[in-house]
Amino acid sequence: MYTTVVYQVKSKDVKAAAHAIAIGQSIGNPTIRNGYENNDHAAEISYVHNDEVVIKYKNKNLNRPTDVAQLLCTIQGGHTDIDIIDECRIRDIFVDIPEYKKIWHHPTDRPLVGGIIKPKSGITVSQLTEIVERMCAGGIDWIKSDEILSDPSYLTLSVRAEAVAKVLDKYRNVMYCMCVNGDPVHFLRQRKHAEDHGLGIHTNFWSGLGIYENPSVYQHFQRSGIRILTDERNPFSISWKVITTLAIMQGVDSIHAGMIGGYYPGDEQEVFDSLYLCRDHNRIATLSCGMNPETAKSIKDRIGNNWLAAVGGWLHEGDITENVRKMRKAVES
């Protein structure tokens, strides 16, 4: 079994660079060999043409194929520091996607409406519960904390989770995702708090791209800041399509795919690539950044029903309940 990676490589000798990647990222130093190396574990170069290099990595070198942290260390690791490689972008990846079991059974006859809690920090428990109540009263489907609001010392995640869960006792089919950003031990503790209260989670990639393997809790992948990894101006970048694939492989339930229209500065094609991957694997693609009823209606006309409109700032201008109703009307029309 293999994981196949498609690279875009800039080098004075692309074939030599391909050899350096394949050998250096599997069994040993590409130029200094020893008698202990086992070629049965070596990565295989399957294609080199112009700047495109395709390499097949053997999954037996990983603990498991979904071990994303070690996989990334393998496919975009030490070769980025050698002089023969000027640029090396991962454009695509081909992996086996495990069977997926949906946790949240949501409406499918229209785009979903999601709300993002504001303010990002400084919120009180009473403000939080009032905002959640108002969103739910308007007919919200999905709510998430902002990625800035994880487990601040002034108002811990455990306190907020308990308060939110009490409100949602009246709205059993609303999915609420607590932000559980944190270092590994802290992340696990926060995820347990959310799970114990019947809530979902969302995590920014800084907490680790390989932390999502937990089928017992709803998990949302938040992309904020991801262009540090995906921007093509980074000579050793990883495409957003690849990141989306790795998130799906781990079993995430929804992915912040990006934005169509609004103030998004990147190429819409990468958003569509992520959207189509989510649809192919029965995951929810969320679109945000400047979302409002007019934008949502325009997007629905372009791509149909299978996505979630995550609304931030606009939802909090005026009456939250009424604004949710306006969003519902826009996606139902």
Regions found by a protein language model. Name each.
Residues 1-136:
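N-terminal capping/small domains of soluble enzymes
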